[in-house]
């Protein structure tokens, strides 16, 4: 942990990437369920559209690795090729890359340090093209900012925020 400068999680930005808060006002449930890169259930797809999923993942990473919020962040990566990165104190960055298929990072998390066969296709680096990144617009995606605020508060704030999100998505 003392060798880690920061942990960087990535997200695609969902179907609403690049929109302002005003543009998001009229979006429907059907709009939220049109994820550009992943096929998932409706609850997680809505969480991806609001970036609440990334806020929850930041909290999870903090707790899993014992890192403060200042060392865990998230950025937008539309191609969904890079799933996460670790920046070390010497400036080196290690990234977990793969095709946009969650079986790869989930399998890695569940079997590490072992390496088991995964049916997901291999990543063709030459076919990837450019890999682009953007900052998360917390004004347009206040759920991400809310999750970070809950992480700062600590205690039961994260659980309360998660419960409120569950109820809100169920009503959406």
Predicted segments, located by residue:
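Catalytic, metal-anchored helix/loop core of enzyme active sites in primary metabolism
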Residues: 1-172
């Amino acid at each position: 942990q003392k060798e880690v400068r920061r942990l960087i999680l990535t997200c695609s930005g969902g179907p609403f990437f690049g929109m302002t808060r005003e543009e998001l006002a009229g979006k429907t449930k059907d709009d939220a369920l049109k994820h550009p890169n992943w096929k998932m259930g409706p609850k997680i797809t809505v969480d991806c559209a609001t970036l609440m999923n990334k806020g929850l993942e930041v909290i999870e990473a903090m707790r899993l690795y014992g890192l403060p919020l200042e060392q865990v962040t998230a950025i937008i990566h539309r191609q969904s090729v890079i799933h996460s990165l670790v920046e070390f104190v010497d400036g080196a960055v290690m990234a977990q890359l793969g095709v946009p298929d969650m079986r790869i990072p989930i399998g890695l998390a569940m079997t590490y340090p072992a390496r088991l066969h995964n049916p997901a296709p291999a990543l063709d680096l030459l076919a990837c093209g450019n890999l682009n990144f953007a900052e998360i617009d917390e004004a347009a995606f206040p759920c991400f900012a809310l999750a970070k605020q809950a992480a700062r508060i600590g205690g039961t704030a994260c659980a309360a925020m998660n419960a409120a999100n569950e109820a809100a998505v169920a009503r959406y």
